[in-house]
Amino acid sequence: MDYLKRIADEQLRLKMEAFGAVLITGPKGCGKTTKAKQQAKSYIEFQDEDERENYLLIANTHPSDLLKGLKPRLFDEWQDAPKIWGAIRKDVDDSGEVGQYILTGSSSAGMDTPHTGTLRISRMQMYPMSLYESKESNGEVSLLRLFEHPDSFTTCKSDMSIDDIKFAICRGGWPASLRGRADKAKLAIAKDLFGQTCSIDISKIDNVKRNANWAKTILKSYARNLCTLADAKTILADVTATCDISKQTYYDYINGFEKLLIIDD
């Protein structure tokens, strides 16, 4: 499958011209690594099982050794080796060069790093693909053009039917779901992501066992209330109507989903 350009490509390029390193965060499967590899000239993947043990040993004992390689150098899922953060920060300070490193991560769980990276490591958030990025929207309406030329808007028509839009909403903007498969297979990507997030990731993020059914109920309630004026109390009431869950436990689950970058309020 050919690479589909992302709106964030230009954002990353500009940040690489201004900072020594850039951290890209976003939920699993939204395309962070693929996008980063378009601009990286070498990379380390900490979840590559063939190399993982060796990489982590070096990262824990002499992390600067992993910085050797063509630049920009990508560190995928860097949070598995948090000492790499300090090594990158120091190298950026010492060299004074911009565009040296890209880091990607699928969680915002607190990392024990001695330095925040401010003014050395810039951050950017990535999301699943928009309909324009997936080439389903014709892009005739541009918010930028409307602001720059408010009188230039003319009537236009979407190439998508109502059924197309409903399907796209259920499928989501996950790049893996855009490969040449049947519609049921495309929907299966979103279903599997939802299931694994609620049954595995929500507990693994901070090693706290959580109830998969409660997690699913909370996310379903969030989905129902997106783009509404519903507050946290309304969603909590919706959840507790079917789950015997306390307010404190509810917010614990919300915190877990925020760490996984699934919820972004």
Regions found by a protein language model. Give the residues of each.
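N-terminal pre-Walker A segment at the start of P-loop NTPase domains
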Residues: 1-13
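Conserved nucleotide-sensing/catalytic segment adjacent to the nucleotide-binding pocket
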Residues: 56-102
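Sensor-1/coupling segment of RecA-like P-loop NTPase cores
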Residues: 94-114, 257
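P-loop (Walker A) phosphate-binding loop of NTP-binding proteins
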Residues: 27
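Short regulatory helix/loop adjacent to the ATP-binding pocket of P-loop NTPases
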Residues: 109-124, 135-140
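Conserved lysine of the Walker
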Residues: 32-33
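Interdomain hinge/linker elements that couple catalytic modules in large macromolecular machines
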Residues: 136-265
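Hydrophobic anchor at the beta1->P-loop junction of P-loop NTPases
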Residues: 24
